[in-house]
Amino acid sequence: MVKIDYKKCGYCGACVGVCEKLAINLIEHIIVIDEKKCNNCKLCTIVCPLNALEGE
């Protein structure tokens, strides 16, 4: 599962736009991952300019 390092996150939304399963949402300046929708493809970890997302 992908985890967010909120200390690194700039809340730019790059991960939201790339998620094919619509599992990532930007809600009031907080990135939220719906674990039920996430298929662990890790595209979000690739596009994050601040390396705030890590896949397990």
From Swiss-Prot:
Cofactor remark from the record: Binds 2 [4Fe-4S] clusters.
4Fe-4S is among the record's keywords: yes
Pfam families reported for this sequence: Fer4
Family annotation (Gene3D superfamilies): 3.30.70.20
GO MF annotation terms: 4 iron, 4 sulfur cluster binding; metal ion binding; oxidoreductase activity
Domain 4Fe-4S ferredoxin-type: 2-28, 29-56
Binding site for [4Fe-4S] cluster 2: 19, 38, 41, 44
Residues reported in the UniProt entry to bind [4Fe-4S] cluster 1: 9, 12, 15, 48
Co-factor requirement: [4Fe-4S] cluster
InterPro entries per UniProt: 4Fe4S_Fe-S-bd, 4Fe4S_Fe_S_CS
Alphabetic keyword roster: 4Fe-4S, Electron transport, Iron, Iron-sulfur, Metal-binding, Repeat, Transport
Protein task: Ferredoxins are iron-sulfur proteins that transfer electrons in a wide variety of metabolic reactions.
Protein name as catalogued: Uncharacterized ferredoxin MJ0533
Source species taxonomy: Archaea, Methanobacteriati, Methanobacteriota, Methanomada group, Methanococci
